């Protein structure tokens, strides 16, 4: 595990023109204008990005496969970013397979609006999400049950885990095996503790809660990629707000799996599932087949998107 496992993750990533100091590599992290790049031999190189990336408004990100030049005793230079399959922003991470959305079973209270926005980002970028409820040893079981109820109809993987006792970690390791997995969520939900439990050699700094606000103190400063379990783990800085990407209001419902599978039953093709006659989704709220709490957050996001569009064309 760790960095010595080099390119089991990228078996097709080979050195190119080694004699000419032109190599392919994988960005592990970026701090300021410097990037740590791992080559196919497992050697780390400190590189800077060429100026043309700034002109093109493109920034390298952890997870990027790149072509770089390197001379002994000098910093390398990133010459090319190879095609990405996706890019998460704030913080930037490229080529992600799965997003592990971490919540706490106790404090801080789960911000399910943030969770829903992260799920939307996954739907837009083709990333497979999984919901992780950490701190289950604190026995706030009703929190886990409430979360399970709200997302059961969506079909997302849901894991109850404890970084402290090890509960659920074997199933989580199986979930992440062979994939590039990004761990995200509010501050102080235990992302770093969870990653330390999964891969002890990380020794990531762990923060606590502010006593006044019960909100987390940020301990992760930069997104960083660690190779493990035939894939990679990424710890991202905690955040409390996430902007939705450019989604048209009419397209929002299709990003909710539990609504999408019933959309063809609605009378109108572009039913927003708000007050339209012949809507097939709203009756499912009344019989408990869909979560009313998640639906209410859908309405909040829908109004947010309508406001954004209105201001866009004002």
Where are these regions (language model features)?
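Short, structured beta-strand/loop micro-motifs enriched in basic residues and often containing a Trp
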Residues: 43-52
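A conserved segment at the C-terminal end of the G1
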Residues: 192-204
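Structural detector for short beta-strands of small beta-barrel domains
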Residues: 21-31
